[in-house]
Amino acid sequence: MRVGLIDVDSHNFPNLCLMKLSEYHTRRGDRVEWWDPAKQYDLVYKSRVFTDTYSKDTIQVNNADKVIQGGTGYGPGENLPHEIEHIRPDYFLYPRFLGTAYGFLSRGCPRNCGFCIVSGKEGRRSVRVADLSEFWNGEEEIKLMDPNLLACPDHERLIEQLIESRALVDFTQGLDIRLISRDNVSLLNKVRTKAVHFAWDNPDEDLTEYFRRFRELTSIKSDRNRRVYVLTNYGSTHEQDLYRVNTLRALGYDPYVMIYECPTAPRITRHLQRWVNNKRIFHSVSDFKDYAPMKKEV
């Protein structure tokens, strides 16, 4: 069987689903490759993480007996079969990322935030779904994709697995700052951490003291490795957005502005995102009102 794969997003991050499908079919003896419109396939998989706002699917497949599409970008759908979900990913599918392992130790989140699909898709409890050995086999770096690791009752044992690996770990999706404790930070301090991500999504919830406490307890020395997603254009005012950005910087964190439904965002929010996320500008222009595009509009 010839199997074609399509990464609809084509962004700078490997598609974990496609890597698992590639490994599964390769083990079955199937021929697996990136889809080529000039060839004929028995089966083609299209996978998309992002919705039309950020990643439009314009790819028409007319050269396959069967086409299966899936991923959060297409809306609710079936999960991967157990034997595929828990297979070690084929990291050779993305050669430029070799040396890095990608996966989930836990799934689900109790927060049920309106802008996030995780609670509806994975459940409102964070549960352990794998051990590290399922997707890591000595790679130098681990990209952990758990939506709310600290909400998982087994999170301490899972963190211990990361410690034992001695790999460089990037907590990519955001640890819950509200669940930080002296005990779990003590464990996190033993992880070889490349970066830790948090989120300050709700402007009506003042998380200042939580961030201050983590800063006092953590062994991560560089503010550029203590990163915080700041959600905007989801019921917040510009003043609330700017307050969170400035507060995080003052506390020793590196904010990163995320815009909900970017096409509907006001111009000032898009300017804020460019100012904050372009770190060369952010570190050289300390006040948003001094950012050049804003000065032109005053």
Task: Please report, for each region that a protein language model flagged, where it lies by residue.
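Core AdoMet radical
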Residues: 5, 10, 45-49, 117-214, ...
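Ser/Thr/Gly-rich flexible loops in soluble cytosolic domains mediating phosphotransfer, phosphorylation
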Residues: 65-93
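A general structural detector for well-ordered alpha-helical segments in enzyme core domains, enriched
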Residues: 21, 56-63, 158, 183-187, ...
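A short helix->loop->beta-strand "cap" motif at the edges of active sites that frequently abuts
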Residues: 62-70, 222-224, 253
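A structural motif corresponding to the C-terminal lobe/cap of the Radical SAM core domain
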Residues: 190, 195-197, 204-298
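Anion (oxyanion) recognition and catalysis
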Residues: 26, 163, 246-250
